[in-house]
């Protein structure tokens, strides 16, 4: 079960990265890890650093993917972003937090991809 969830997560991140590249964003980091956790994607959108949380699902019976980001998760992502900015010497950079929700069909094809800019 955990392996299937990891695979779904990787598929979602790949779909999100392709989508963002088509929009003209530059991927700076995928799965950036530190002791506090992991950032799914870090991209540049012009002069803005964007921290992207990707949520992938195969159905909506448990709610929408973007609804699964709790207040605690948002706080953790802000901390991770601050750590990233400190590591890269970019603490003065403009940044935002986006969410990309990817819904896959049973064959693993993207059924719907939604991008929420400035999600929190």
Curated annotation (Swiss-Prot):
Gene3D superfamilies hit by this protein? 3.40.1350.10
Q: Which SUPFAM superfamilies match?
A: Restriction endonuclease-like
Which domain of life does the protein's organism represent?
Bacteria
* A UniProt-annotated Pfam family: UPF0102
> Annotated Gene Ontology MF terms?
nucleic acid binding
HAMAP family per record: UPF0102
Could you say which protein family the record assigns here?
Belongs to the UPF0102 family.
The molecule here is called UPF0102 protein PTH_1707
Q: Which organism is it from?
A: Pelotomaculum thermopropionicum (strain DSM 13744 / JCM 10971 / SI)
């Amino acid at each position: 079960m955990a392996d299937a969830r990891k695979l779904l997560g990787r598929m979602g991140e790949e779909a999100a990265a392709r989508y963002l590249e088509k929009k003209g964003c530059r991927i700076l980091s995928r799965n950036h890890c530190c002791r506090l956790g992991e950032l799914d994607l870090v991209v540049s959108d012009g002069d803005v650093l964007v921290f992207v949380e990707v949520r992938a699902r195969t159905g909506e019976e448990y709610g929408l993917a973007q609804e699964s980001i709790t207040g605690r998760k948002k706080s953790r992502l802000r901390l991770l972003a601050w750590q990233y900015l400190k590591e890269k010497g970019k603490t003065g950079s403009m940044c935002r937090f986006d969410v990309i929700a990817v819904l896959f069909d049973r064959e693993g094809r993207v059924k719907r991809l939604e991008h929420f800019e400035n999600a929190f």
